[in-house]
Amino acid sequence: MFPHYNIIQNIEFGAERNKKNKNLTVHEVIKFLNLEHVKDKFPHQISSGEAQRASLARSLLSKPDLLLLDEPLSNVDQSFKEEIQVKLKQILTELKITTIIVTHDSYEAFYLGTKCGIILDGQLKQYDDPYNVYHFPNSVEVVNFLNRGILIPAKVTGENSLENYDLGTIKGNFIKHYPKGSDVQLLLQPEDLEHDDQSNLKLEVVDRKFRGTNFIYTLKTLSNLLIPVFVHSHHIHQHEVDEKFGIRRPINIDHIVCF
């Protein structure tokens, strides 16, 4: 931002560059980005999060043909970030601005993007819609980068089944064909296992994180695998660390991803 302009002058600079933009006003963008209380201040007088939002406001008002945003909300308080994400997505859609967003926050990418690209070591490893990137990662590298599950050893036992030493039989639809007897690495995501205290398959709870709408349990198997499992926070049977956690059998996964 220009240091000799106050915040509203900096934002208005974007509007002046595109006077034909009638869909979004300076007042509207200041309000939705919660900048009303700092609009008369200068850049050196505001926080990094406020400066980041002011820069975003100016960019939106200029209505470019292509907008590149590098970690646009990295300094925004978490309590306010989700609200901005909703409004930002709405504005980008309404103004039909083609936007490339660079972020390390996969959830932010999944929400804001119609397409997601995973870039590792300067190479584009996967480019697809967010659902497919999450549920059908195309390599171990992408799985490790997203960090939304664990790869466990298994043996293919049939067209729709495989076997794991700790979990037993797992059934589902293979995304890729593997001959019977193949040794594979199965992607197990936190939502793939269901809690059932009546089950004879019990795993030890080694960690529990409360995330508002759900708990994320980390369970240890006999072979010392650490498996994450989601459980809704309203679930009546909550478990503490060192307790046993039942896993429903048979284990059924909609789509089986292996490597």
Features from the language model and the residues they span:
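Non-catalytic connector elements of ABC transporters
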Residues: 149, 160-259
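C-terminal boundary and immediately downstream tail of ABC-type ATPase nucleotide-binding domains
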Residues: 134-157, 187
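Short, solvent-exposed coil/turn linker segments
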Residues: 42, 101, 129, 153, ...
